[in-house]
């Protein structure tokens, strides 16, 4: 999926907002997380993730040297994580093992995982089709505190565009 000029500008602006939250990014090596909802078709992921990462790399020197975590969210009980160079995730071979899994998932379970295992990440991009469910809005707000709400950027793929939602 090719990003439009508007989507590119929105992405850059939102990422800058996240990185400039007081106490978040201090100028050293950036640690970031890319969470992909396995409900997305393989072709969409294979096109969109590299486009997003290359856009960020072109945007700022901060993304030249990144500790990159790639997480595939398959179900509430199945989440796979890889630590790799960010540029590896821009190659088509990186997605050879990707398999689409449309299962019912709870947003709260993903947030709980991120709270426990990805607390060091200064930027968390979540690429989804929006098919997850939210069972308890209060629980979501609670899990967003103290840090997830300042670091999480939800990117929802629709048929022809990318919706960027800054979750505070």
Model-based region annotation:
Residues 25-127, 131-137, 155-165:
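Von Willebrand factor
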Residues 49, 138-145:
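Conserved Walker B catalytic segment
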Residues 54-59, 112-116, 142-143:
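A generic secondary-structure signal
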């Amino acid at each position: 999926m090719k990003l439009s000029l508007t989507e590119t500008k929105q992405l850059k602006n939102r990422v800058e907002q996240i990185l400039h939250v007081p106490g978040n990014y201090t100028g050293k090596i950036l640690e970031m997380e890319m969470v992909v909802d396995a409900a997305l078709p393989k072709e969409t992921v294979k096109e969109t993730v590299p486009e997003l990462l290359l856009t960020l790399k072109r945007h700022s020197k901060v993304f030249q040297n990144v500790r990159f975590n790639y997480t595939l969210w398959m179900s509430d009980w199945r989440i796979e994580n890889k630590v790799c160079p960010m540029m590896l995730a821009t190659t088509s071979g990186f997605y050879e093992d990707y398999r689409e899994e449309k299962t019912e998932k709870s947003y709260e379970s993903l947030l709980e995982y991120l709270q426990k295992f990805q607390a060091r990440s200064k930027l968390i991009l979540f690429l989804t089709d929006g098919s997850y469910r939210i069972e308890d809005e209060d629980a979501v707000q609670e899990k967003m505190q103290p840090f997830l709400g300042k670091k999480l950027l939800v990117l929802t793929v629709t048929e022809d565009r990318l919706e960027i939602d800054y979750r505070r």
